[in-house]
Every structure is written in structure tokens, then in C-alpha cells.
Amino acid sequence: MSQRKYFGTDGVRGEVGGPVINAAFALRLGYAAGRVLAREHREHASGRGRNRPQVVIGKDTRISGYMLESALEAGLSAAGIDVLLAGPVPTPAVAYLTRTLRLAAGIVISASHNPYQDNGIKFFSAHGMKLPDDIEAAIEQALDEPLGCVGSEELGRARRMADAQGRYIEFCKSTFPHDLDLNGLKLVVDAAHGAAYNVAPHVFRELGAEVHAIGVSPDGFNINKGVGALHPESLAEEVRARGADLGIALDGDADRLQMVDGTGRIYNGDELLYAIVRERMQRGPVAGVVGTLMTNYGLERQLQQIGVGFERANVGDRYVLEQMQARGWLYGGESSGHLLCLDCHTTGDGTIAALQVLTALRRADATLAEWVADLRMYPQKMINVPLAPGLDWKTHDGLARARGAVEAELAGRGRVLIRASGTEPKLRLMVEAEDEALAQASAQKLADSLGA
């Protein structure tokens, strides 16, 4: 595929008012996407159903969402596309609505876990998955063409969805077994002042839990600020203070999950993924799990011990999903809390992932600590080394020798990961080992080989 000009691995993202996150670009993007979707609709229309394609737009709670939503709506309408405005809903809700309403595409306005100063726009296909590469490429090409407008009789209509949140709440609940409930469970749910603020608490409450909700007072500027999956320590304090059984933390667009138990212990994506997979194994065989380059070595070892395959993808839920689809596997995720259960949904969903963890705990009548007790997480040490101009670390003899020595010493008791930073001229040296001292010494040995 040719180099992308506008789209990154997760749509278009940047600072509000910058080159791509502004009203003018969003208008052009809406028109370009509309033209491509209209063409696809004409080429694949069966002669039945809607005369023109429909698209749903959902957003998180950033103040800039109003501006971008209006601009996208105008561009899509100018291209002859009908628009459904879902308002503030989680990213995975847009994927669900697109699929269940048989729409041409879904559009999400969100910068996920970033602060309010940033925003982004990404698309879902009619199947609730990422757009095919050829469609993204066609939209990029159309972006460089002049802005136009269809005839007045062909303009798209727009209407607000009154039931978007309610539909999604029911979908989430449908992924929790009908023979179970959450009666007697005391939860703290942190929605990060984000897209799930009026959704997630209802899901758990309607299943029977006693819910105390935090991070549910968005003002356009406080999304992810000191709350949510990026700051689970806030949730841990609230769980302890209220004597709750568990805490559930989502990020700004609710596709990421962290959990906390009654003692205040924080559980990351690797531990929660294991909790889900262990329960699924009691229903039948699990062929394999996809993690990333950053997935803890302890999860890899534990999965191997219980007979589950494990593969690493590049960092990013897009790459995890691609590898899951290529292998036909159902489960995958990232340490950050992006968890994919393709037997429940087509994309990562923090609320649904939490329900799958709760399913495991209710079935086993166990605490979270008890359920993942056999998963031993390996201590991790990372050292960032500045890269001298012109230095090719991949062919550096000293680093190669040090890496060989470290890997020989670890010999199945840990792993080494060396990768260049994508944002600054630094080399990231990461070692995971059975004990912290060994991880520290091994990482330092790698750094010393570069004169750091």
C-alpha cells in the first residue's frame, strides 16, 4: 500500500486547530468520504433498500467534538449521504450501531486517551471493522480533489438518534450470561469524564451491581484528566475508601480497560486478558492469543504452560486485530487495556471486556486476585538511550554482543526488546526477567554497550 498522507494507524489525529483537526479539513474529509461511500453504494446496490447510504457519527466529550461533528455532517450531506448523529457514545458503540443498523460506515470523533486539546476522526466499515485499505486510499485521493456539492434534490438528511446509548447498553448486557447476575457486587466505575459517562454505569447497575460512578461529569475539557484507565490510582483510592469489591476504569472513548480489586491492587490488560481466556478455556479449547511487543513475558509463559498459542503483533490494537483475523483466533489485547474478544464484538470494548472478567469471577466464585494467581508477571526495566546522529543500532557490534550475552543469561527466564522510539531520537532498551535485580542489571548491560 502507498504511503498514507492523512490517515495514521487509527484514522486522523492531532491537535485541535492543527493541519488536520480543524473545521475546514473535517468538511473536506466528510465530503471525500461521502463521495467514496456513495460510489461504493452505487456499485454494490442490489436494487433494494435505501436509495442512498447512511452513516452514523459518534463522539466523545471534548469541546471540539461539536465543531468537527457539524463539519463532517455538512461534508457528508453535500456528497448525498444521510447522517445519524449518535452524540456522545463509546467508540465500540459506533462499531456496533454501524453493523446492527446496516449502515455504510461509522465515524468516531475522539482522540481516545489523549487530553482535550487533541481530537481525531476514524472510520468503521459496514461490518464494524476498520475500513479496508483500498477504501481509505480512495478517501485520501478524494481529499485532494475540489470540494463540491450534489444537486439540491440529492442532498443528505441528518437526524439525531434518541436511542443510541440505550441500544448500546442492551448490546453490552447481551454479552453477559443470562444465568448470571451482579447482585451483591459493589463496584466503582470510572468513565474518565468521557464517552461512556452515561452508558457504563447503567450497564453494570442494570445487571444488579451496586454502582458508585466517578468520572461522569464531563465539561468538554476534563476528559482523561486525572481519571480513567490512564490514572487507575484514583480509582484504587475510591475503591478502598468505599469498601467496594472491584473498580472498573475506562478511557475517554471507552475502548480501554483497567481494573482494581478491593485491596487497591491495579490489574493491567495482560492480567485481564488472562482472566478472560482462562474462563473461556472452561467452555472449550482456545487456539491462541495475540499480544504485542510490550505484552509481559509472564503472560506468554503462562499461556504456553496451559497449552494456548501466543503470538506478538506490533503495538496497536489495529495490528493485534489483523493478526487475530489472519490466524482465526478470538482473543487478543495490549497491556494498556485494549482487549479484543471477537466472540462478543468486532472491536476492542472496555465495558464488554469488564463484563467478561466479571463472568469469570462469578462462574468461579473467586476474587480477581485468586483467579489470576497462577499468572506470574515478570519485572520489567526500560532504559531510554539517546541515539547519536548517524548511528545504526541494528548493526552496532557492541550492542549485538551485549544482547547475545543477556539473552544467553536469561535463557527462557526473560526476554529482551530493543526498538527505536517513534517520536524522538532515542533507543528503548527493555528487559523482563524473573527478578527485578536481573532485569535492571541486564538492561544496564545493554545501555553500557552503547556508551550510555
Curated annotation (Swiss-Prot):
Its cofactor is Mg(2+). The modification Phosphoserine is found at S112. The active site is at S112. Keywords: Isomerase, Magnesium, Metal-binding, Phosphoprotein. InterPro entries: A-D-PHexomutase_a/b/a-I, A-D-PHexomutase_a/b/a-I/II/III, A-D-PHexomutase_a/b/a-II, A-D-PHexomutase_a/b/a-III, A-D-PHexomutase_C, A-D-PHexomutase_C_sf, A-D-PHexomutase_CS, Alpha-D-phosphohexomutase_SF. Belongs to the phosphohexose mutase family. Gene3D superfamilies: Alpha-D-Glucose-1,6-Bisphosphate, subunit A, domain 3, Alpha-D-phosphohexomutase, C-terminal domain. GO terms for cellular component: cytosol. This is Phosphoglucosamine mutase. It comes from the Bacteria. Its EC number is 5.4.2.10. GO terms for molecular function: magnesium ion binding; phosphoglucosamine mutase activity; phosphomannomutase activity. Coiled coil: none annotated. It catalyses: alpha-D-glucosamine 1-phosphate = D-glucosamine 6-phosphate. Mg(2+) binds at S112, D251, D253, D255. GO terms for biological process: carbohydrate metabolic process; peptidoglycan biosynthetic process; UDP-N-acetylglucosamine biosynthetic process. Binds 1 Mg(2+) ion per subunit. Catalyzes the conversion of glucosamine-6-phosphate to glucosamine-1-phosphate. Activated by phosphorylation.
